[in-house]
Amino acid sequence: MEEKKEKEILDVSALTGKQKAAILLVSIGSEISSKVFKYLSQEEIESLTFEIAKLETITSELKDNVLLEFKELMMAQEFIQKGGIDYARELLEKSLGTQKAVDIINNLGSALQSRPFEFVRRADPANILNFIQQEHPQTIALILSYLDPQKASFILSSLPTEVQTNVARRIALMDRTSPEVVREVERVLEKKLASLSSEDYTSAGGVDNVVEIINMADRKTEKFIIESLEEEDPELAEEIKKKMFVFEDIVLLDDRSIQRVLREIDGQELAKALKSVDIPVQEKIFKNMSKRAASMLKEDMEFLGPTRRKDVEESQQKIVSLIRKLEEQGEIVISRGGEEDVLV
């Protein structure tokens, strides 16, 4: 029985992807593995930690086979980035043989199919901006909808103001994009890139997508886009605003939530954030502080004197980010006026 188990564990092809990842992380050591974890989600970290805990004795042969497969996959990815799948297959066939090349490309296939615009995601945002700003707004909208919100937000904020609203509107109205369209845009942006083999429509864009992007933009960009959309498409603007949270919306928080937020905020940051807001917003904050704390905050606001609008908006953005984070964690509730927010 033990002999059979030993024979099976030497066969890399019998291992799952998670088991291979666990063996790889153990093989490269804790110092490098901890750096890898920084790029993983909490769920992925927990899953891999569980797999590592389940590992028994790892033979040298098994470890070497896993490391070799990882090396081959990394080599294939590098070739694909340089010249596409055909180029990668040609080089792999020359160095590893036809069958091995086919196996490696097949292993990478599913990942390539599910990640359009991979080469754009790896690029520096400033380079992407230079790369796409002359493109049609619909093309820009398609590309931004596939990027992570932080990178997309930087690019959207950096576009000419007359283009920002157009692009944001197109992202919000985007529903499903044909793989043929995605492939065509990819061909224009990169001469050789792995084409999508799936004929299913890929979801990208939509109101939630544009809200996430705008939420990460600076206040000036956020305000400009919303005000412009209110003129061009009031219904869409209203739908977006319902899903957004801006600093002035702090009045929508119940007292318990505001008190929870205040525990996390630096006093000087809060003083700056309140400098230019309406009295009702300030009063909502003061109401949820002790008299002494409220008095100290008012003194801090007066002591600050004239403050650059940019600094005020940065402080407001930090607090908004904290509020959104606490809402995601379920620690506070933001009432947006929907039926789901009604207390019973």
Swiss-Prot record:
Gene3D superfamilies per the UniProt record, alphabetical: 1.10.220.30
Signal peptide: none
Membrane topology: Peripheral membrane protein
Keyword Membrane in annotation: yes
A single GO BP: bacterial-type flagellum-dependent cell motility
NCBIfam families: fliG (TIGR00207)
Name of the protein this chain belongs to: Flagellar motor switch protein FliG
Organism: Borreliella burgdorferi (strain ATCC 35210 / DSM 4680 / CIP 102532 / B31) (Borrelia burgdorferi)
Gene name as annotated: fliG
